[in-house]
Amino acid sequence: MDRGRCANMLKSLQRTLAKCQKSPSTNHWQCFKRNFTSIRATKYPGRSNSTFHYWPWFAASTLLATSLYYRDRPVQNDDKTDAFPSHTESIQVDSSVSDFPLTITALNFPVSTTFKLLGYGQRHVTFLRFKVYALGLYLAENDENLVSDTLNETYLHKYFLDVDDSKTPKENLARLLKRDDSKSVMMIDDLLDSGMRMLAKITPVRNTDFKHLKEGLVKTISKHPDVANNKDTLAKGLSELNDAFSRKGSVRKNDDLIIELLANGALQFSYHDSKNNEFEVMGVVNNQLVGKFLFSQYLCGEKSPSPQAKKTTIDKLITLL
């Protein structure tokens, strides 16, 4: 092979790569395809005096094109806990439904403030091992400071004796949140009592109905460890939940149930018909235990409906300590 021609070929490819990386367009793969067609093809002699047309160009360009192509592919997160990519506006929670937005605002959903994604995962039916819905858990943007204001060094030494003095307060709090189910429930419940606003986005991965969604919420709430001490109050709250979920009928795959935890502890339920892009505010549950127990189960404890969503959410909360 002519080394001079090979060197020129590589220089041309390097110039193409640099040009596409600096392109204002976000799709570097399309940029490469446009520019590569203008590069002059060259012949190189092969073995036994035969001639291979363009093969060095093809090999090198394939490597380059593959790099650019996968650089522009959307992020996929089925059963993964990767950090949120900073350059995207959404993330794939499950491949069978639409990506979840990293930010939810009153401009695109019937919510009271701006929410940022904390964590995500899927809900599985344990004994059958099939997925039921994708779940995203969000925190009000203006309430991020409540995490460090509530779970701080003073809180740590006031309520816990097993503090490792060789660790920082943040490391001790992180250990308790991640490794001690009973203490994590106490910590998350105190955090929710601070008035922290949250939001859950539930997107079915198969066709279902409002009855099944409501039953799932009731089961999740009923698994909170403090239910036995609050039976009467919670019973009234579940009655409110039943009224808020009075709508009947089917819920299509990829529709959304939006559950907003308000500052006063109330829950607002909204439904998004994704096919027609229509929203409906279904109702409000004012009983504070319902909202507190529901989001507590999402965030902590051994009976969380989505361990993946719990893990990714706790990991994100720890960064806010």
Curated annotation (Swiss-Prot):
SUPFAM superfamilies: Chalcone isomerase. Residues 1-72 form a transit peptide. Pfam families: Chalcone_2. The keyword Calcium does not apply. One of its GO terms (cellular component) is mitochondrion. GO terms for molecular function: intramolecular lyase activity. Belongs to the AIM18/AIM46 family. PANTHER family: FATTY-ACID-BINDING PROTEIN 2 (PTHR47284:SF3). This is Altered inheritance of mitochondria protein 18, mitochondrial. The lineage of its organism: Eukaryota, Fungi, Dikarya, Ascomycota, Saccharomycotina. The gene is AIM18.
